[in-house]
């Protein structure tokens, strides 16, 4: 099954603010989510969210098997991403 990767508007804005070389690496990793989203990332404890590590950055996403899509909810530096993400959800 191939999943569509959808960026939440907040994730898209955060991705645009990241340095281009790092942003390119993140986009490469996001492409891998299309085929096997549960194998690429790591499930966050006590939630239905997943985390993808790309150097010092993390991508927080959710897998919707019913719609065959991966929703990227947040992108940020590892020092702040989980605190910032918890404030949103």
Spans of features found by a protein language model:
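Enriched for short, Lys/Arg-rich terminal
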Residues: 1-5, 24, 54, 62-89
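A short, surface-exposed loop/turn module that caps and links secondary-structure elements
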Residues: 28-53, 82
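Short aromatic/hydrophobic contact patches that present stacked aromatics
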Residues: 12, 51, 60
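Generic alpha-helical structural signal
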Residues: 12, 24-27
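Short, flexible helix/strand-to-coil boundary loops that buttress conserved ligand/catalytic motifs
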Residues: 19, 37, 85-86
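Basic, amphipathic "hinge/linker" alpha-helix immediately C-terminal to the N-terminal HTH DNA-binding motif
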Residues: 7-11
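Surface-exposed, Lys/Arg-rich phosphate-binding patches that contact polyanionic backbones
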Residues: 14-21
């Amino acid at each position: 099954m191939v999943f569509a990767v959808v960026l939440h508007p907040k994730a898209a804005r955060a991705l645009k603010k990241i340095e281009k070389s790092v942003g390119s690496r993140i986009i490469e990793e996001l492409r891998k989510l299309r085929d096997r989203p549960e194998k690429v990332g790591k499930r966050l404890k006590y939630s239905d969210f997943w985390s993808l590590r790309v150097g010092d950055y993390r991508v927080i996403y959710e897998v919707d098997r019913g719609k065959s899509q991966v929703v990227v909810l947040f992108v940020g530096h590892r020092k702040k991403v989980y605190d910032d993400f918890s404030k949103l959800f």
